[in-house]
């Protein structure tokens, strides 16, 4: 048989040197590899691991097969092969049984909806990485991912002839590449075999080290500094914002997603002089001696002894106002002290750093003690600060629990206290705001009445307050406040882009995933050196966006940029957050992905762009986030990527509302509640402990009528006044939580490579949705497999894995009344309204594994105990004739109830003081309501609301809603009917706070529900109601809501309020009458 050209070439290449034999052996190895691989893939459908391939080849060749052998094949055919480590959790290693009667190995058919017990599953989910080799040359393309396991397309079984053709085609390509390589190296007078073995070294895969992401970031930055690489690599190429917008339009993924693009013109600076002379030394700490007009106005007002509220835009230099005011007084009065109050420790640390930078430039103040006083301050440091501090940076919690009850140790500080600064005043709202306002009144009372310090002034800042003067008066219990709102700071042009992901092919409603769209945009911004902060409205979106960005960098060969972007949110350890803040501040990160944790004014350096992954919770949040960009007076970009929720799509349709930068009316009223007895009593008890209460003296600090009633009924009296009750002793402030009760924290422990470090802390209420055995927990965009969840010891152990699927919990939440304490009728209706004990039951019964295309690839069962939360709330059972009208009109009942609940919750702030998360309801999930199959879990036709804070006794908010329910429902109905939208929007029945994205909504159904509850006759409104089915929802095939039938028990001391007569269509009132008799 005549020798082929390749064999002739091999002979001439290394006759007598052994090289010919080496290449011949290499050829034989490839033949065996090619044949075995094709057979395994086409007939056995098994994973081609290194171990699986080695055994048969070693038997045939009678030699050891090494990684270098496969790496040499990779070196010749880099585009046709894959040789890498993959995580065992990424693939499915199916157990096979050999059966001669049925043709060999048998593989089990998989049903993705068959629940597998997680305990059994975890026995096979080890963290080992598998080394695989595969051909991806188009002959038999395959990608080993979890989705293969459930592919709906059966992998074909090839005939022997077809397999031979595959083998021959691949071998021909191999020989061609080998021949070309030998010729090229010989032409260069190089040894071909040595060159091939050397080249193969770079193709030998190495197991992933799974380094901690924060450590990886710090290591990369350190190496960059050591190599003297500027942090702003390629920064010489500056992309302007208009250029960046055009570049986005020219990307391959652009398909007319930009629906609106607005430009707010730049603004020049306005300067103004002071009406008095600052201490000359003050100017040593300033970069320039000119003041913006609003800075001068505020400093002048403070000099005249006024209380000041500043509402100019974000990054307009508000901080400098109170910094300079304090420094001037420090220089003029050596005894003066100052208190800076911030809502978070991070913000306090940030402001202390900025303040110290100014002080460091003023020699006369270099010895002034300026420090933070918070929960992290060590005991020995606290004593020193109490005795020596001139300026403290603290938070409301420390004032409440440490400074006020312990005020004797703060005698000197409080006696000389000149200025109290409360930044980010808009944070103090709802229950928390009411608590903090009472703390401020206790502080003012002590300074006035005990330390005779009548010169105390207050200064506050916020860019997003609806009624700033009134809010500040309420917060501090003061009568006069000066408003500074004319902004004199310069700004560059601000560009606002509204981006709507494209509708997917063959879908009428479903759009491209907004997280993936946001990731593509963020990558482009980073590549063009546009320093960006991306805001996400919840933690999970933050992590998923981080994951997508990392994947894009890896897929596009830009692994060098992986450490240039980090995520930042609550739950991360304090040390990790400080490291990320520091790197961002010094310009070492090109982007940061955050929840609203960075919405506050923490200085993280100059930013060019804000990317919003989904619309924020409120218009105030939108303006706070948008204001983070453009801090160097350059042009800035705000780019909003809309999700498919009705709220986001509303702003896509009506973007003009986003331009109302200074329209205070678009912000929520932040009214404070001083009539909530539950809140008020706690602070009066604390105040009595700090200084005995005297009615005439103290009525200016607390509501007079409530003060007298609480003192007489709940406090002890002697000749000195009223003292705290024994129930609150020995330390009343410990009995009063400003934040509605702190939850237990669960530690997330990373056990990868024996690391055993806590990477996050998670609230107990979140664990059911984030930590379950076998689930994927995402941290810094990397997936971690939950190996152990211990609810008793409050920890979870997680291990880093490399998979491209995530897990979505399968859960349900039932909110049900347990006991009736109060019952009343409406003014013009027989429908009863109930108030009493509420039980919320959260059950996670399993989870889906979901690939990056949102396809379900597995279903796993879990056995977590239910989470039960007891609270207080109110509920209204939907009248039966409302159900009948909805059915007659073909309206979805679940959507009707859901829409009515949203409308009522949206109206609550007009009648009671409640934040968006302080009263909650049972939201309707699209997975259930839009299901194809009938569900056994039917829910009663009921509107229900409950206090989310205050524990089993509630916060007192729902009982106030109960008192005002007539006006609330009437106003809710009026708002729906006056709203011009067709299917629901944030102004009527859609809600940004909805946990289910407001997808199950029926605006006309909500009208029916509220009309019927208010007792309106069908004839009076039926013609105004649009017929269904609703165009904003898919075809509804199952009914999930049934009339209320279960009986709710009455409490032993229940009360009937304003009962008019028996209801027409149920037996509730009969039960009431029996109970009353």
UniProtKB/Swiss-Prot annotation:
GO cellular component: nucleus
InterPro entries reported for this sequence: DEAD/DEAH_box_helicase_dom (IPR011545), Helicase_ATP-bd (IPR014001), Helicase_C-like (IPR001650), HRQ1_WHD (IPR055227), MZB (IPR018973), P-loop_NTPase (IPR027417)
Pfam families reported in the protein's UniProt record: DEAD (PF00270), Helicase_C (PF00271), MZB (PF09369), WHD_HRQ1 (PF22982)
Catalytically driven reaction(s): Couples ATP hydrolysis with the unwinding of duplex DNA by translocating in the 3'-5' direction; ATP + H2O = ADP + phosphate + H(+)
Helicase ATP-binding domain ranges (all copies): 299-483
One GO process term, biological-process aspect: interstrand cross-link repair
Protein function: Helicase with 3'-5' helicase activity involved in genome stability. Functions in the RAD4-dependent nucleotide excision repair (NER) pathway and plays a critical role in DNA interstrand cross-link repair. Unwinds relatively long duplex DNA up to 120-bp and requires a long 3'-tail of at least 70 nucleotides for efficient unwinding of duplex DNA. Activity is significantly stimulated by a preexisting fork structure. Shows both processive helicase and DNA strand annealing activities.
Family: Belongs to the helicase family. HRQ1 subfamily.
PANTHER family recorded: ATP-DEPENDENT HELICASE HRQ1 (PTHR47957:SF3)
Protein name: ATP-dependent helicase HRQ1
Organism encoding this protein: Saccharomyces cerevisiae (strain ATCC 204508 / S288c)
């Amino acid at each position: 048989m005549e020798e082929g050209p390749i064999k002739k070439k091999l002979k001439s290449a290394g006759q007598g040197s052994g090289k010919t034999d080496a290449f011949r052996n290499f050829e034989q190895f490839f033949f065996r590899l090619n044949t075995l691989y094709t057979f395994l893939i086409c007939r056995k459908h098994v994973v081609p691991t290194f171990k699986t391939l080695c055994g048969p080849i070693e038997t045939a060749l009678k030699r050891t097969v090494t990684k270098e052998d496969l790496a040499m094949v990779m070196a010749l055919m880099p585009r046709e092969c894959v040789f890498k480590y993959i995580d065992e959790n990424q693939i499915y290693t199916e157990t096979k049984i050999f059966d001669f009667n049925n043709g060999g190995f048998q593989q089990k058919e998989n049903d993705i909806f068959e629940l597998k017990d997680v305990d059994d599953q975890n026995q096979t989910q080890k963290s080992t990485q598998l080394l695989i080799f595969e051909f991806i040359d188009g002959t038999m393309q395959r990608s080993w991912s979890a989705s293969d396991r459930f592919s709906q397309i059966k992998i074909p079984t090839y005939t022997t002839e077809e397999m031979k053709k595959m083998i021959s085609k691949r071998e021909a390509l191999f020989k061609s590449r080998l021949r070309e390589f030998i010729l090229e190296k010989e032409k260069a007078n190089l040894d071909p075999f040595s060159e091939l073995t050397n080249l193969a070294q770079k193709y030998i895969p190495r197991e992933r080290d799974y380094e901690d992401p924060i450590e990886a970031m710090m290591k990369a930055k350190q190496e960059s500094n050591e190599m003297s690489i500027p942090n702003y690599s390629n920064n010489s190429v500056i992309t302007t914002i208009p250029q960046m917008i055009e570049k986005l339009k020219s990307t391959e993924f652009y398909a007319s997603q930009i629906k609106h693009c607005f430009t707010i013109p730049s603004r020049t600076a306005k300067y103004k002089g002071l009406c008095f002379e600052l201490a000359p030394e003050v100017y040593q700490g300033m970069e320039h001696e000119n003041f913006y007009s609003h800075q001068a106005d505020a400093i002048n007002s403070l000099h005249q002894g006024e209380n000041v509220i500043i509402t100019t835009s974000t990054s307009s230099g508000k901080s400098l106002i109170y910094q300079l005011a304090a420094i001037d007084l420090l220089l003029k009065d050596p005894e003066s002290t100052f208190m800076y109050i911030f809502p978070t420790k991070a913000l306090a640390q940030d402001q202390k750093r900025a303040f110290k930078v100014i002080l460091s430039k003023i020699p006369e103040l270099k010895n002034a003690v300026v420090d933070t006083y918070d929960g992290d301050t060590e005991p020995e440091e606290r004593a020193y600060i109490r005795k020596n501090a001139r300026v403290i940076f603290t938070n409301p919690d420390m004032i409440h629990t440490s400074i006020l009850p312990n005020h004797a140790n703060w005698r000197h500080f409080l006696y000389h206290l000149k200025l109290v600064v409360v930044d980010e005043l808009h944070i103090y709202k709802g229950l928390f705001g009411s608590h903090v306002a009472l703390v401020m009144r206790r502080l003012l009372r002590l300074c006035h009445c005990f330390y005779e310090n009548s010169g105390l002034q207050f200064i506050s800042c916020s860019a997003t307050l609806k009624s700033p003067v009134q809010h500040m008066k309420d917060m501090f219990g003061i009568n006069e406040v000066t408003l500074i709102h004319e902004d004199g700071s310069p700004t560059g042009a601000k560009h606002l882009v509204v981006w709507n992901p494209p509708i997917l092919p063959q879908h009428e409603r479903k759009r491209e995933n907004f997280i993936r769209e946001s990731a593509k945009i963020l990558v482009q911004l980073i590549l063009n050196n546009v320093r960006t902060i991306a805001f996400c409205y919840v933690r999970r979106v933050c992590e998923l966006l981080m994951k997508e960005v990392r994947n894009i960098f890896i897929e596009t060969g830009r692994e060098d940029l992986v450490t240039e972007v980090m995520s930042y949110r609550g739950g991360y350890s304090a040390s990790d957050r400080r490291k990320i803040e520091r790197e961002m501040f010094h310009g070492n990160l090109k982007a940061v992905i955050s929840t609203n944790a960075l919405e506050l004014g923490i200085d993280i350096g100059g930013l060019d762009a804000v990317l919003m992954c989904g619309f924020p919770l409120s218009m105030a949040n939108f303006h706070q986030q948008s204001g983070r960009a453009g801090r160097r007076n350059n042009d800035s970009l705000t780019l909003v990527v809309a999700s498919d929720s009705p709220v986001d799509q509303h702003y896509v349709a009506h973007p003009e509302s986003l331009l109302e930068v200074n329209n205070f009316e678009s912000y929520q009223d932040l009214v404070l509640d001083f009539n909530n007895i539950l809140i008020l009593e706690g602070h009066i008890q604390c105040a009595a402990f700090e200084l005995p209460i005297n009615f005439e003296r103290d009525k200016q600090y607390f509501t007079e009528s409530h003060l007298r009633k609480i003192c007489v009924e709940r406090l002890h009296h002697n000749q000195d006044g009223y003292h705290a009750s024994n129930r609150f002793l020995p330390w009343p402030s410990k009995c009063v939580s400003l934040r509605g009760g702190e939850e237990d924290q669960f530690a997330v422990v990373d056990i990868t490579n024996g690391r055993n470090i806590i990477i996050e802390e998670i609230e107990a209420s979140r664990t059911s949705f984030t930590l379950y055995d076998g689930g994927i927990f995402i941290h810094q965009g990397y997936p971690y497999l939950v190996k152990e969840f211990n609810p008793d010891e409050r920890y979870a152990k997680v291990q880093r894995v490399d998979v491209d699927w995530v897990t979505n919990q399968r859960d349900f939440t039932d909110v049900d009344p347990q006991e009736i304490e109060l019952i009343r009728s409406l003014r013009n209706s027989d429908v009863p309204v109930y108030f009493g004990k509420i039980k919320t039951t959260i059950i996670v019964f399993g989870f889906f594994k979901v690939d990056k295309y949102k396809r379900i690839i597995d279903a796993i069962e879990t056995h977590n105990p239910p989470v039960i939360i007891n609270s207080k709330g109110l509920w209204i059972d939907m009248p039966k004739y409302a159900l009948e009208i909805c059915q007659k009109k073909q309206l979805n009942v679940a959507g009707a109830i859901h829409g009515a609940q949203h409308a009522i919750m949206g109206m609550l702030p007009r009648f009671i003081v409640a934040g968006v998360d302080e009263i909650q309801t049972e939201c309707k999930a699209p997975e259930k309501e839009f299901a194809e199959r009938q569900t056994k879990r039917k829910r009663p036709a009921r509107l229900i609301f409950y206090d989310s804070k205050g524990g089993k006794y509630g916060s007192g908010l729902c009982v106030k809603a109960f008192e005002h329910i007539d006006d609330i429902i009437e106003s809710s109905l009026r708002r729906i009917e006056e709203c011009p939208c067709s299917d629901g929007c944030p102004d009527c029945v859609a809600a940004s706070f909805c946990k289910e994205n407001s997808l199950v909504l029926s605006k006309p159904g909500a009208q029916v529900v509220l009309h019927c509850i208010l007792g309106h006759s069908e004839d009076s409104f039926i013609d105004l109601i649009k017929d269904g089915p609703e165009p904003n929802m898919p075809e509804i095939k199952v009914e999930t809501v049934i009339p209320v039938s279960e009986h709710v028990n009455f409490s032993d001391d229940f009360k009937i309020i304003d009962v008019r007569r028996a209801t027409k269509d149920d037996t509730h009132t009969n039960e009431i009458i029996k109970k009353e008799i």
